[in-house]
Swiss-Prot record:
PROSITE patterns: PYRUVATE_KINASE. It comes from Lactococcus lactis subsp. lactis (strain IL1403). Mg(2+) binds at E252, D276. This is Pyruvate kinase. Its cofactor is Mg(2+); K(+).
Length: 502
């Protein structure tokens, strides 16, 4: 059985060699990227089970990310497998400003009182912490007395005890001992801040990614609050001639949860970004929302990626904790299409081991989906011919113990709909366009491949059998299910045929 749950692996310096030096060694960042050595490390991740690589534009400039993308193309050649390319936007965010005296951080103790400035363009001091807010917003009027300001992923909490309208500053009191570092993330739960739908930097980053050789296949849009946030990115993709790029809305706050249905409808999929979500909403609700989101996205037949802190301890340790293993396992049982590695593979000590561990857990968990899974295919929409065929394919595969479904698909939609039903079989998606092929890398159970478009219906079924045999997924004498649209090029799926491989 092949691994059907996909892995999104974030790339960063952990797998990159510069001037013969590894990340963490003295002088590393002063050296040029060694493309060949780095590509071999990335190829190793592909061999261990990475299906999609994530380029996190919260870190690194365009030259760095462009070189990283080019290195992945070389890694594909070494590994002999293609992967998907996912650009993750920085998104609208707040961070602490630099300190006026050049300090990296200041220490505070419980009960310390000081101020937080909402005016933009200031520098921090021990008495006044300045904020850098996306879009240059002044958030003074958006935050109420009694709310909590969280710094550095919630490591430090500040109670907002007063507001000074004359200076537009917050009066705050430290809830615990901690430090305030420069350029650390700031969250204010239960607050609706009127960020622009798309920050200027995100617009530039997206256009840069789309312009790279080979382009990108997925965009993860950070801090999506409404469907309009997704539509803004869709507009850029269409404007630049990239309507095929799939958009994953990152659900990270209460507003995103409240508007979940409209966001799912507007996007091609959802990324459950549990890091910021765990700060923006009550932490005990994170697993509840994870199950809710996965269930809704499964029903819609779209992509769902579970992300953040999945194997966090492997950033520093060669083995995951038992709770982390359970976390990955349960995400698969919940119905996720893919699980994601962040710091573990981007800047951790054990990127290859992290991918291997996640692949092992994913593969084990998928064998128990039928017994423990939370899918309810009987509730899925069956109002179209393609939906009915997709449901029938799953039933036929299970009734006849068929291990391979071959879907000939121009847009990828047929394979996605079959994947939605989680059949106990691999789904070999035969496409005729590399963009479609790469766009299927993230879907559960789908093994995409590309070939020449058949010229007739008879040729179509012959091609399906030939490609299936060449893939090594079946042998002569095995039964396969072939799903396609007849006649060729109709753009709709209306035919299911069970065929014995010659």
């Amino acid at each position: 059985m092949n691994k059907r749950v996909k892995i999104v692996s974030t790339l960063g310096p952990a797998v990159e060699i510069r001037g013969g030096k590894k990340f963490g060694e003295s002088g590393y960042w002063g050296e040029s990227l060694d493309v060949e050595a780095s590509a071999k490390n990335i190829a190793a991740l592909i061999e261990e089970g990475a299906n999609v690589f994530r380029f996190n534009f919260s870190h690194g400039d365009h030259p760095e990310q462009g070189a990283r993308m080019a290195t992945v193309h070389r890694a594909e050649e070494i590994a002999g497998h293609k992967v998907g390319f996912l650009l993750d936007t920085k998104g609208p965010e707040m961070r602490t400003e630099l300190f006026a005296d050049g300090a990296d951080a200041i220490s505070v103790v419980t009960g310390d009182k000081f101020r937080v400035a909402t005016k933009q363009g200031l520098k921090s001091t021990p008495e006044l912490i300045a904020l850098n807010v996306a879009g240059g917003l002044d958030i003074f009027d958006d935050v109420e007395i009694g709310q909590t300001i969280l710094i550095d992923d919630g490591k430090l909490g500040l109670s907002l005890t007063g507001k000074d309208a004359a200076t537009r500053e917050f009066e705050v009191e430290a809830q615990n001992d901690g430090v305030i570092g420069k350029q650390k993330g700031v969250n204010i739960p239960n607050t609706k801040i009127p960020f622009p739908a798309l920050a200027e930097r995100d617009d530039a980053d997206i256009r840069f990614g789309l312009s790279q050789p080979g382009g990108i296949n997925f965009i993860a849009i950070s801090f999506v609050r409404t469907a309009n946030d997704v539509k803004e990115v869709r507009r850029i993709c269409e404007e630049t001639g990239n309507p095929h790029v799939q958009l994953l809305a990152k659900i990270e706050n209460q507003q995103g949860i409240e508007n979940l249905d409209e966001i799912i409808e507007a996007a091609d999929g959802i990324m459950i970004a549990r890091g910021d979500m765990g700060i923006e909403v009550p932490f005990e609700m994170v697993p509840v929302y994870q199950k809710l989101i996965i269930s809704k996205v499964n029903k819609a037949g779209k992509i769902v990626v579970t992300a953040t802190n999945m194997l966090e301890s492997m950033t520093y340790n060669p083995r995951a904790t038992r709770s982390e293993i359970s976390d990955v396992f349960n995400a698969v049982i919940d119905g996720t299409d893919a699980t994601m590695l962040s710091g573990e593979s981007a800047n951790g000590k054990y990127p290859r081991e992290s991918v291997r561990t996640m692949a092992t857990v994913n593969k084990n968990a998928q064998t128990m989906l039928k017994e423990y899974g939370r899918l309810h295919p009987e509730r899925y929409d069956k109002s179209t011919v393609t939906e009915v065929v997709a449901a029938s394919v799953k039933n036929a595969a299970e009734a006849m113990d068929i291990k391979l479904i071959v879907a000939l698909t121009e847009s990828g939609n047929t394979a996605r709909l079959i994947s939605k039903h989680r059949p106990n079989a691999d789904i070999l998606a035969i496409t005729f366009d590399e963009k479609v092929e790469r766009g299927l890398m993230i879907n559960w159970g789908v093994i995409p491949t590309m070939t020449e478009k058949p010229s007739s219906t008879d040729d179509m079924f012959e091609v399906a059998e030939k490609v299936a045999l060449a893939s090594g997924l079946v042998e002569s004498g095995d039964n396969i299910i072939i799903v396609a649209g007849v006649p060729v090029g109709t753009g709709r799926t209306n035919t299911m045929r069970i065929r014995t491989v010659k």
